[in-house]
């Protein structure tokens, strides 16, 4: 969609979880500038961040963690994930209060300047992302899911034929 990865500005918005950790490593390797916007005490794994930052410096890109969602400006891509990971028994009201300022809605997309919105699914519509954005023209959520299907099939084929 953007024609390149090197130099692209990616904002991950939400819980600093395994997806964020993987995005930091992949971004560092591919030369993307990745910033994680998450609430206090919900940042990605510090050890992963430090290691990915070493890679990023070698590849001329930057990684950052930010709690202030008002700083989400001038990004190319917004990426999010579910607010509640498997096995997390935190009450939904507690989760909602903590993460609602980080909801991917049209105002946040407009503020960010992003041309692409991603979500790795499953999505909880009305929580981490609104219907308007998920079904909107900047969303590549379902393309992303289709691509993941093909990747999974290729890995399975390789493993079966190994």
Regions found by a protein language model. Name each.
Residues 2-80:
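Glycine-rich phosphate/diphosphate-binding loop of Rossmann-like nucleotide-binding domains
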Residues 10, 34, 117-118, 155:
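Hydrophobic/aromatic residues located in beta-strands of well-ordered beta-sheets
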Residues 18, 22, 47, 103-104, ...:
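Conserved active-site and cofactor/substrate-binding residues in soluble primary-metabolism enzymes
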Residues 22, 26-29, 51, 111, ...:
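Alpha-helical scaffold segments in soluble metabolic enzymes
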Residues 37, 118-120, 144:
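Generic beta-sheet signal
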Residues 54-132, 138:
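Rossmann-like adenosine-cofactor binding region
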Residues 135-162:
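C-terminal helix-to-coil terminal segments
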């Amino acid at each position: 969609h953007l024609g390149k990865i090197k130099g692209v500005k990616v904002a991950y918005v939400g819980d600093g979880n395994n997806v964020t950790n993987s995005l930091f490593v992949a971004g560092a390797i591919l030369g993307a500038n990745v910033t994680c916007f998450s609430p206090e005490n919900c940042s990605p794994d510090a050890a992963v961040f430090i290691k990915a930052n070493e890679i990023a410096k070698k590849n001329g890109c930057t990684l950052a963690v930010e709690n202030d969602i008002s700083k989400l400006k001038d990004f190319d891509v917004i990426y999010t994930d579910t607010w509640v990971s498997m096995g997390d028994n935190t009450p939904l009201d507690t989760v909602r209060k903590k993460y609602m300022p980080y909801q991917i809605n049209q105002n946040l997309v407009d503020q960010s300047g992003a041309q692409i919105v991603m979500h790795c699914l499953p999505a909880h519509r009305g929580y981490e992302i609104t219907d308007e954005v998920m079904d909107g023209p900047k969303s590549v959520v379902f393309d992303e899911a289709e691509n993941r299907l093909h990747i999974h099939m290729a890995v399975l084929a390789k493993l079966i034929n190994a």
